[in-house]
Every structure is written in C-alpha cells, then in structure tokens.
Amino acid sequence: MSIESNTALALAYFPAFRDRDAQWWDAHIAPGFVRHDPGLDFAVEGPAGIRKLAEVLHGGFSDIAYPILNVVAQDDRVLVHLRQVATHSGEYEGRPATGTRTDIEVMDLFRVEGDRLVEHWALMDNLNLLKQIGAVDA
C-alpha cells in the first residue's frame, strides 16, 4: 500500500474504535495484531484484543472524541499525535464516575501490512488522565 493508503487506514482506526465498529476491526486488524502499551495490564492481540480494550475504555468513558494534531508517515509506519477527549462516566481504574470531561495527549504508531494494521505502539498521558478524574493527587 502507499503512504497515503497507510495513513488513511491508521486514521480510520480512531472512529472505528470510538464507535466500537467490530466489522471494521475484523476487516482491518490483522489476526496477529499486537498493541504495545505500557499502560495496560492485559494483552491486546488481534480483533478480540481491540474489543477488550474498547470494553475497558468505553466502560469508564463516554462522548469520546479523537482530535488529530499531527500525522507522520514513512514506509509501513504511521505516527498519529492526537488528543483523547471524553467524559468520565463509569468506573475506571477503580475510580467511580466523576462526570469530569478529560483531555489528554496520545501518541500512536501503527505498522501496516497490506490493508491491515499489524502492530501498534501506544503512549497515553495516563498520569494526567488519573489526575483529571481524581484518582491521584494533582
């Protein structure tokens, strides 16, 4: 695929994740997909792993938006710098819903093979997120 196609695929991940689009995941997340994320205490592998990740995040947050700030692509890699803006509407990391509108920065690097995402490195500002919902002192 071209750099443009790879970029379009990586950017399409965010609305699909926000909308919990299982059809998109099955079509565009490789069976051997792996998400490398030091902030998670469980493995995210293949479409089933994305489903589990969505359950965890959507269980704690609603009204999620992913404003894209920057995109850089080279060969089979696409780096997306974005914000995750959401309402803390359910339990997350043991903290009950606060109704707080959260806003954190995220860096996602994707590796593409063909028309599928095969690898994902994610860095989220989890400390800032936990501060915003009152789970840790500011």
Please identify what each model-predicted range represents.
Residues M1-A138:
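C-terminal and inter-domain tail/linker signature
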